[in-house]
Amino acid sequence: MPAIQPPLYPTFLLLILLSLIITLYVWIISTITYKTAVRHAALHQRSFSRWSLDHSL
């Protein structure tokens, strides 16, 4: 019976490694997305304020 069941320790280690990789991947992507979003928001805000100023004159 124990031959069919995979050893617990390597499976556990693999799961921990997988979760670490996923967490790191998600963290990197969210950081990049946040930075780009902030940059884009600043750009849009700047262009929008300039546009509204041009039209108010």
Swiss-Prot record:
Q: Where is the protein situated, by its record's location annotation?
A: Virion membrane; Host cell membrane
In the bilayer, the protein is annotated as:
Single-pass membrane protein
Q: Which Pfam families match?
A: SH
Look up the record and report any one GO term of the cellular component aspect: membrane
Report whether Membrane shows up as a keyword of the record.
yes
Say what the protein does: Plays a role in the inhibition of the host NF-kappa-B pathway. This inhibition occurs at the receptor level, by preventing the signaling of TNFR1 as well as IL-1R and TLR3.
Membrane spanning stretches: 9-29
Q: Give residue ranges on the Intravirion side.
A: 30-57
* Originating organism: Mumps virus genotype B (strain Miyahara vaccine)
Q: Name one GO biological process term.
A: symbiont-mediated suppression of host NF-kappaB cascade
What's the name of the protein?
Answer: Small hydrophobic protein
User: Which gene is the coding source of this polypeptide chain?
Assistant: SH
* Keywords for the protein's UniProt record, in alphabetical order: Host cell membrane, Host membrane, Host-virus interaction, Inhibition of host NF-kappa-B by virus, Membrane, Transmembrane, Transmembrane helix, Virion
- Superkingdom, according to UniProt? Viruses
Q: List all topological domains (Virion surface).
A: 1-8
Q: How does it assemble?
A: Interacts with host TNFRSF1A, RIPK1 and IRAK1; these interactions interfere with host NF-kappa-B activation at the level of receptor complexes. Interacts with host protein UBQLN4.
Family the entry assigns? Belongs to the rubulavirus small hydrophobic protein family.
Matching entries from InterPro entries are given as:
SH
